Amino acid sequence: MENTPSHINKTEPSLDKTYSPQEIEQPLYEHWEKQGYFKPNGDTSKESYCIMIPPPNVTGSLHMGHAFQQTIMDTLIRYQRMQGKNTLWQAGTDHAGIATQMVVERKIAAEEGKTRHDYGRDAFIDKIWEWKGESGGTITRQMRRLGNSVDWERERFTMDEGLSNAVKEVFVRLHKEDLIYRGKRLVNWDPKLRTAISDLEVENRESKGSMWHLRYPLADGAKTAEGKDYLVVATTRPETVLGDTGVAVNPEDPRYKDLIGKEVILPLVGRRIPILGDEHADMEKGTGCVKITPAHDFNDYEVGKRHALPMINILTFDGDIRSEAEVFDTHGEATDAFSNAIPAQFQGLERFAARKAVVAEFEKLGLLEEVKPHDLTVPYGDRGGVVIEPMLTDQWYVRTAPLAKVAIEAVENGEIQFVPKQYENMYYSWMRDIQDWCISRQLWWGHRIPAWYDEQGNVYVGRDEAEVRRDNNLGAEVALRQDEDVLDTWFSSGLWTFSTLGWPEQTDALKTFHPTSVVVSGFDIIFFWIARMIMLTMHFMKDENGKPQVPFKTVYMTGLIRDDEGQKMSKSKGNVIDPLDMVDGISLEALLEKRTGNMMQPQLAEKIRKRTEKQFPNGIEPHGTDALRFTLAALASTGRDINWDMKRLEGYRNFCNKLWNASRFVLMNTEGQDCGQNGGEMVLSLADRWILAEFNQTIKAYREAMDTYRFDLAAGILYEFTWNQFCDWYLELTKPVMNSGSEAELRGTRHTLIQVLEALLRLAHPIIPYITETIWQRVKNLKGITADTIMLQPFPEYDASQVDEQALSDLEWIKQTIIAVRNIRAEMNIAPGKPLEVMLRGANAQAQRRVLENQSFIQSLARLSSLTLLAEGDKGPVSVTKLVEGAEVLIPMAGLIDKATELDRLAKEVAKLDAEIERIEGKLGNEGFVARAPEAVVAKERERLAACAEAKQKLIEQQATIAAL
């Protein structure tokens, strides 16, 4: 017993009066961690179960998406741990190249007025490590608050020495196999940060722009079918005209097909460029002629490759017009196929100034046909905040096609399963059309590319410079410089499942826990992370027979968490909810400061302030971790986006209270009493037999839900059993026994109370760990359990022998009868405590048996002064009636209600509902409201209308019943 958490008072006879998560959660977590309960049990004869947390950015702090995914992961880990498996849940953080570099750059700019260039590369990187030491642990501290049962001693960081070695090893081996190469290709270029960025870091914004229609004169006296001596091309980026190397028309287009193979003379530069036939030109769109700029547009780049067009780069890395262009062939080699001259008037211009200058020149030459307003999608860098340029640069690439083939087969043959299954199609569509992966970034923070150059520009790849010199016989007199670039962070996180277990060493951890069991991830990174992990892992990890090993057997995909109106949570919308604010509570002032302080766009602050004050007039109450986890589990319908609902959170906080109070009731009736654990005769009441049957059916359904990743169903099953069956019915049904049962009956009921509550706590533990451990520590002694923690107790198993079908059907009938009486009380406005006379008319043999065997139960729970079975043919007095299976329930009304008063009350209630129905119908009939209001608001009004109509119908039926008395 020495391991009982110190804050649990062992001598106190019962639980504290009120459930206070703030007092129990943190001390309990510290106790669990200190005792080492989160570590694998080390029993390699047992099946192992392993989850790797998707590494959050080291710069980050916990948001709702993390809380959601980590609740699911912890629920799975606790569930599997309780089944005796050797479980490892491993956490870590990602070095987050660009994000971390920017955080530290902003910090030194604000505090010291310096840039990273003032520091120099090595000193700046030292500065980042220093920052990581001070601030990098925020997210892991917050993860502990969620109750995450992570083995913290195995925490990893993507720039750890071990992981850095694995990254080098992978790079060197892929390069040896010709699966990594350096090439000149088009990338997303951020001119502000001066680096290539991934598609995930590009934010496409809708904007109003222009479409310029420009005339390109035909060469050699050629004419169009309409007799014109020029083609008109439409473009949204006139500045790129300087880099055009062709004009495409559709080969089927009757207007232009005779011109294919002829040339136009490019205005401003006088370059002769070919007219090509290509499907890329759409006859229906614009003029049907498309200018082709292979060095500055992703589609044009593909067209250029198909037709072997040279590529002309006209921009510097800052996004300005170059003083002379760079001309390359389709392989990225320099060529003199075209002149590299750029007219002097455009040289050095910033790209948007160049746009204006080019348009002005076309107008001056009489070659501007027209300008039309145009809605367009513009790519912005999500961190630099400037327009992204497709840019021709030298980068390192992974040749993905051979890796993708194996990774596709792993999903096709079921080695990896997606939950929900529809995400497999998304995976296939991307993998079957996969492009080579640009893995280099022009940053300082990250894994530096293990490649060196000599003065002639030869490239050598190796694990370090010494290896490069040794393998290539390069003496000390040969000067080498290392590649300045670093690797895309997705490259190192792509090795996450095996590098964190010690690869390339063949460690015991790798043998025990790889492949891992499941990965829980958002669908937005299915390509960036999931697909790349599958490709890289299967290439490097092989089983003892040399067969490629998958990184995980199941991919559980989550949707996004949105606000209550279905909007994406973002700082600029001011609708972000911090999960820890729901756990600990936050005042309105602090919440406003959080939402409006340090805003990138301060002009939005007032709108956000108003919205927040309306939504949270008193701030947010503390709800505790368990209520947050329960809500997240309950909302986790597979793969769909979730609209966050504060009312659900309150409901699950109430659930925790209900469980606490029910446990107090059980303890008050069992502590210090004979609960049958020492033998002695036990008689189980119908209610005892019924709750055991209900509970076993609950275990079965709950396990099925957990085994199929239906956490929403599991949470619903747990809620329904605990609240409705156990608390509302069973605890009430024990009261007649407690008041007047025999010793054997008392023993039976106490024994059942303890048995069901103790197992229910184990059932609920994976979702709500804190409250269940706290209560279990009190209940375990009554069951004679000496173990230290619920975490390592066996998970409840379904026992068919406990399912007494007769008890289930008998008690269901009794419940229906009691509900019938309660409904009549409510409809007739009769006080709940007023004893009633009740009669049963036309009862069949089954109903009669049930009444005779359980009369005291029924009378006690329905608050009856008498319960009479009417003889056959006896109609009984004037009564309000309800049908139950095999009988009719009668409550004589004589002396119970004043008919006139009651009818008057009902008429007033109907009138009130009529007014409300009219108000809502008016609102929904207003087209402006329906069109402008958020979808969720309109849906709420429609639900309210349906509820009012239903309530009105019920009142009308009651009026008819009373009028007939």
UniProtKB/Swiss-Prot annotation:
Coiled coil: 896-965
Binding sites annotated in the UniProt record for ATP: K571
Motif 'HIGH' region in this chain: 56-66
Compartments, as annotated in UniProt: Cytoplasm
Main location: cytoplasm
UniProt keywords, alphabetically: Aminoacyl-tRNA synthetase, ATP-binding, Coiled coil, Cytoplasm, Ligase, Nucleotide-binding, Protein biosynthesis
GO molecular function, one term: valine-tRNA ligase activity
GO cellular component terms, semicolon-separated: cytosol
Reaction(s) catalysed (UniProt annotation): tRNA(Val) + L-valine + ATP = L-valyl-tRNA(Val) + AMP + diphosphate
Region (Disordered): 1-22
Motif ('KMSKS' region): 568-572
Gene3D superfamilies cross-referenced by the UniProt entry: HUPs (3.40.50.620), Isoleucyl-tRNA Synthetase, Domain 1 (1.10.730.10), Valyl-tRNA synthetase, C-terminal domain (1.10.287.380), Valyl/Leucyl/Isoleucyl-tRNA synthetase, editing domain (3.90.740.10)
Uppermost EC category: ligase
InterPro entries per the UniProt record, alphabetical: aa-tRNA-synth_I_CS, aa-tRNA-synth_Ia, Anticodon_Ia_Val, M/V/L/I-tRNA-synth_anticd-bd, Rossmann-like_a/b/a_fold, tRNA-bd_arm, tRNAsynth_Ia_anticodon-bd, Val-tRNA_synth_C_sf
Superkingdom of source: Bacteria
BP terms from Gene Ontology: valyl-tRNA aminoacylation
SUPFAM superfamilies to which the protein is assigned, alphabetical: Anticodon-binding domain of a subclass of class I aminoacyl-tRNA synthetases, Nucleotidylyl transferase, tRNA-binding arm, ValRS/IleRS/LeuRS editing domain
Domain notes: ValRS has two distinct active sites: one for aminoacylation and one for editing. The misactivated threonine is translocated from the active site to the editing site. The C-terminal coiled-coil domain is crucial for aminoacylation activity.
Job description of the protein: Catalyzes the attachment of valine to tRNA(Val). As ValRS can inadvertently accommodate and process structurally similar amino acids such as threonine, to avoid such errors, it has a 'posttransfer' editing activity that hydrolyzes mischarged Thr-tRNA(Val) in a tRNA-dependent manner.
Homology family: Belongs to the class-I aminoacyl-tRNA synthetase family. ValS type 1 subfamily.
Quaternary context: Monomer.
Protein name in the entry: Valine--tRNA ligase
Record organism: Yersinia pseudotuberculosis serotype I (strain IP32953)
Gene: valS
